[in-house]
């Protein structure tokens, strides 16, 4: 089965207090086990990952260095996204390669720095929803809004985070290179952090200050690759309605009519579960016999067998 995996933040940083490169590398080693399990089972796997915490951390480091010495330049947001794509891709490709070699599997694992075209008139630019960086208390968030002009929103009851524009992906610039590598048997890591958001200006591609949601980028890649399945891996075993309430209910399988109903009820948090569900819906509608599943990282293999996760069907 040809699968596109979308890896969430927990696949890169398990401990929110440990933001070090060493901590990320160790978490990637654990993530590589779940990825290698799928490859060992004979699945053709391509990988997309998020970058919310990392892009916020890199940006904060750059801003702090500039405050200490204004000779240290500030970098545009799209460039910061490119930094994160290389940083995370480097860790993922090496840990997946290492885990495969332990199992006697010799496959090339490669990261492609990916630009993703967005519409400059996308409404997402006027309504920031994508959380980045660390979690803050309400008081800390209010101070950041006042001092730095950030837009801060509560993130699924876990605290407050900065939110930035999150336009939808229109196309992938490097799609032909990705398709060629996948068809040649490479394990490709692409659209890292949703890809570097760019708009077309004649023959030129211009970066824009935004973070494309990795779930929508993964869906776009899955369509381009004509994948059989889109597997979005996150921190929870199943999608829930009435989340964090006494009557919380885990969903094993939902059809598109139910998806629309739950979205209308506001059951899924913007910037969190909502884009995952919407990306799955879009992929299921993209062709016949398309499989879309939201599951936990550790239960990825079980989710493909129907033993875990939430399956979205027509």
UniProtKB/Swiss-Prot annotation:
It is found in: Cytoplasm. GO terms for molecular function: ATP binding; carbamate kinase activity. SUPFAM superfamilies: Carbamate kinase-like (SSF53633). It catalyses: hydrogencarbonate + NH4(+) + ATP = carbamoyl phosphate + ADP + H2O + H(+). It is an enzyme of class 2 (transferase). Pfam families: AA_kinase (PF00696). Coiled coil: none annotated. Pathway: Metabolic intermediate metabolism; carbamoyl phosphate degradation; CO(2) and NH(3) from carbamoyl phosphate: step 1/1. NCBIfam families: arcC, PRK12352.1. Belongs to the carbamate kinase family. This is Carbamate kinase.
């Amino acid at each position: 089965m040809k699968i596109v995996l979308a890896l969430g933040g927990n696949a890169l940083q398990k401990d929110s207090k440990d933001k070090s490169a060493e901590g990320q590398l160790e978490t990637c080693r654990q993530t590589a086990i779940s990825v290698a399990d799928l490859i060992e089972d004979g699945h053709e796997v391509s990988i997309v990952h998020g970058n919310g915490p990392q892009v916020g951390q890199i940006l904060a480091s750059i801003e702090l260095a500039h405050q200490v010495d204004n000779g240290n330049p500030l970098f545009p947001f799209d460039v910061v996204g490119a930094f994160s794509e290389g940083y995370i891709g480097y860790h993922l490709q090496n840990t997946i390669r290492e885990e495969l070699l332990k199992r006697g599997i010799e496959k090339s694992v490669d990261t492609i720095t990916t630009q993703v075209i967005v519409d400059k008139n996308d409404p997402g630019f006027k309504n920031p929803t994508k959380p980045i960086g660390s979690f803050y208390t309400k008081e800390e968030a209010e101070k950041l809004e006042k001092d730095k002009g950030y837009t801060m929103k509560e993130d699924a009851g876990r605290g407050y985070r900065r939110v930035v524009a999150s336009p939808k992906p229109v196309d992938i610039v490097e799609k032909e290179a990705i398709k060629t590598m996948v068809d040649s048997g490479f394990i490709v890591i692409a659209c890292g952090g949703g890809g570097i958001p760019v708009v077309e200006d004649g023959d030129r591609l211009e970066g824009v200050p935004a973070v494309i949601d990795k779930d929508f980028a993964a869906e776009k890649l899955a369509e381009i690759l004509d994948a059989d399945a889109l597997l979005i891996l996150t921190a929870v075993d199943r999608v829930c309605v009435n989340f964090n309430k006494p009557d919380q209910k885990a969903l094993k399988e939902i059809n598109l009519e139910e998806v629309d109903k739950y979205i209308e009820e506001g059951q899924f948090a913007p910037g969190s579960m909502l884009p995952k569900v919407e990306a799955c819906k879009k992929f299921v509608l993209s062709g016949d016999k398309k499989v879309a599943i939201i599951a936990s990282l550790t239960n990825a293999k079980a989710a493909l067998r129907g033993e875990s996760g939430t399956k979205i069907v027509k």
